[in-house]
Every structure is written in C-alpha cells, then in structure tokens.
Curated annotation (Swiss-Prot):
Keywords: Activator, Developmental protein, DNA-binding, Homeobox, LIM domain, Metal-binding, Nucleus, Repeat, Transcription, Transcription regulation, Zinc. This is LIM homeobox transcription factor 1-alpha. One of its GO terms (molecular function) is RNA polymerase II transcription regulatory region sequence-specific DNA binding. Residues 161-204, 252-284 are annotated as: Disordered. Residues 195-254 bind DNA. Disulfide bonds: none annotated. It comes from the Eukaryota. Gene3D superfamilies: Cysteine Rich Protein, Homeodomain-like. Residues 256-269 have a biased composition (Low complexity). It comes from Mesocricetus auratus (Golden hamster). Residues 33-92, 92-154 form the LIM zinc-binding domain. The keyword Transferase does not apply. GO terms for biological process: axon guidance; cerebellum development; dentate gyrus development; locomotory behavior; memory; midbrain dopaminergic neuron differentiation; negative regulation of neuron differentiation; olfactory behavior.
Length: 382
C-alpha cells in the first residue's frame, strides 16, 4: 500500500517538473520578428523598434532621400521620413506664398486657408491685415474693405459699350447692385456724376506679356502679378483688372459659341422635319377622309353575313313560345322585306351615304335591338 502511494507521488512530481520545463522553453523560444520596412524575418543580433514595430538597422532610412535616420524620424503611412522632407510633403502650406508653415509659427486663418502673418495682406495695396480688420476673400485673394469698394465703383462705372468683353458672374452681380444704388440716389437728386477715370492703353509688348501669362494660368497668384507689373511698368491693380476682363471675355465667347451651335442644331432639325414629314403628312390628312365607299350589293351581302352569323346564338337559349313565327335565332334572312329592284338598292346606298360619318357600325340598315323589338310586337299582336 505504501509503495503504491510513493509511486503516484513520484509520477505527479515528474508531470509538474515537465510542465514547468516546457513553459520555460516556450518563454525562451519566441517567434522571430518581421521587419516593417522590407517584410523579412529579422535574424540580426540587434534591431530597432518604432511605434510597436520592428525594423532592420539598414531599413531605417528616409523614403524620399534614402538617407539613414539616426536620432529622429517621422512616421506616416508605414513609411519613415526625415524632418525636411516630411515638412515639405505633408506640412500645411501658406495660401499666399505656398510655402510650408512651421509648427512654431503664428498663422492667420480665412475660411479654409492658412496664411503667414506677413502674407496675410491685401493683394492691391499690400497692407498687412490685423485682427479685427474687414476684408474680402475673392478667388483665393485677400482684399481690404477700401480696395474692395474701389473695385465695385470701378466695375459700376464701366459702360456696357466699353466693356464688350463681358464680366464674370460675381462681377455682374456687383455691377447690378451698384447700378441699382445709383438709380435710387439719382431719383432723389442727391447723386452727382462721378468723373471717369483715365483709361489705360496697353502697348503691344505689354499685351503680349499678359496673353502669354494668361495662357499659362488664367488666375495668377500675387507673385506672378507683381513680376508682370515690374516687367511692363504698370501697377498691380491694372494687371489684376486686365486678367479679370480677359477671363470674362473668354466666358462670353464660350457662351456665344455654344448659343450659335444650339441655333444651328435647331435650324437643321426644323429643315429636316419639313423636308421629310411635311408633304407626306399633309397628303395623308387630305386623302384619309375620302375613302372609297363599297357598292350597295357588297353592303347588303356584308349585313346579311353579320346578322346571320353563329356568334349571335352563342350562350343564348331560344325562347320556347308557341307559333312558327317566333324564331329570333333562326336562319331566315334579315332583308326579306326588301325588294330586289334597283330602286331599293339605291335607297339603301343613300342611307349609307347619309350615315357614313357616324361610323361603320351605325351606318348599317338593321340592328339586333330593332329586331328584338319587332319580335316583341309580333308576339303581343298575335
């Protein structure tokens, strides 16, 4: 009995030691790590750990310049970047100079755009806008309140004959509001005629430079306008107005061309409809009412075949009445009272001609209802 107990205790102790040994082996032998960069198993002695992922030493390099990263790095979309290329690719850019904005810089925001403090200025007078100033963001460009009102006055003074090039949608709305205000003040007698500003006449070289820049971009940025103004010797305001007028002119030409194409298509459709379907439709409308009438003999044969046909007796039970004269569904002819001379047939033809407009069914001489009435009268009189 004691020997059996000792054997069980030795067996249990052996199981416990084997389990502890296997657990130790499991902790020591861990699965090999996979590099996040090259997706290969890391078998090196040393490895690098970045954001809970493992890397080879040679795989830790910038994805743009391929330079090894030693001290710091930037991680985005499972790729590593150095500071310079990360800011160049992913940093927020200024809406004025289109350069990257450093994280430690102060910025000014206008709707969805972000600007440097030095770039947050009016595109006409180049006055830096401060906090609390009123401004207008038009086509991605900043305008202070004074220059915006001047632009509205300038657009309102342009007559329709002088501005044959047309205006854009937003400029047209501004002009309409300005003209409406002017009319109201002139009726009150308080408005006086403003002096017209001198019109700038461009030279051939200036016009060529503007057109070449317009072909590249119809809405140039502030730097491009400044360079054009410096090259041509004009002000930035004149350059901006020329580009606005040119854009409006292109829009008007496109609308006019589209309208001409629509007019041509409409004229072609009308001409084709007149040549193809006009004459035939008219002749058909004239000839349809005057169809040939059948002869009286044909009409008589048709009526006899219609009223003596078998479908009149389908689903009906002949009445069981005394007398041989009651055979409403019999085979006796319908037109037995008519004479066979030509006069009766001519009268029948006149009857058909008189009732031809009422339809073929109404123009028949006999009628099943009349036949039933005649049978009823003959029954009660007998």
């Amino acid at each position: 009995m004691l020997d059996g107990l000792k054997m069980e205790e030795n067996f249990q102790s052996a199981i416990e030691t084997s389990a502890s040994f296997s657990s130790l082996l499991g902790r020591a032998v861990s699965p090999k790590s996979v590099c996040e960069g090259c997706q290969r198993v890391i078998s090196d002695r040393f490895l690098l750990r970045l954001n809970d992922s493992f890397w080879h030493e040679q795989c830790v390099q910038c994805a743009s310049c391929k330079e090894p990263l030693e001290t710091t790095c930037f991680y985005r979309d499972k790729k590593l970047y150095c500071k310079y290329h990360y800011e160049k690719l992913f940093a927020v850019k200024c809406g004025g100079c289109f350069e990257a904005i450093a994280p430690n810089e102060f910025v000014m925001r206008a709707q969805k755009s972000v600007y440097h403090l030095s770039c947050f200025c009016c595109c006409v007078c180049e006055r830096q806008l401060q906090k609390g100033d009123e401004f207008v963001l038009k086509e991605g460009q900043l305008l202070c309140k004074g220059d915006y009102e001047k632009e509205r006055e300038l657009l309102s003074l342009v007559s329709p004959a002088a501005s044959d090039s047309g205006k854009s949608d937003d400029e047209e709305s501004l002009c309409k509001s300005a003209h409406g205000a002017g009319k109201g003040t002139s009726e009150d007698g308080k408005d006086h005629k403003r002096p017209k500003r001198p019109r700038t006449i461009l030279t051939t070289q200036q016009r060529r430079a503007f057109k070449a820049s317009f072909e590249v971009s119809s809405k140039p940025c502030r730097k491009v306008r400044e360079t054009l103004a410096a090259e041509t010797g004009l002000s930035v305001r004149v350059v901006q107005v020329w580009f606005q007028n040119q854009r409006a002119k292109m829009k008007k030409l496109a609308r006019r061309q589209q309208q001409q194409q629509q007019d041509q298509q409409n004229t072609q459709r009308l001409s084709s409809a007149q040549t193809n379907g006009g004459g035939t439709a008219g002749m058909e409308g004239i000839m349809n009412p005057y169809t040939a009438m059948p002869t009286p003999q044909q009409l008589l044969a048709i009526e006899q075949s219609v009223y003596n046909a078998d479908p009149f007796r389908q689903g009906l039970t002949p009445p069981q009445m005394p007398g041989d004269h009651m055979h409403p569904y019999g085979a006796e002819p319908l037109f037995h009272d008519l004479d066979s001379d030509d006069t009766s047939l001519s009268n029948l033809g006149d009857c058909f001609l008189a009732t031809s407009e009422a339809g073929p069914l109404q123009s028949r001489v006999g009628n099943p209802i009349d036949h039933l009435y005649s049978m009823q009268n003959s029954y009660f009189t007998s």
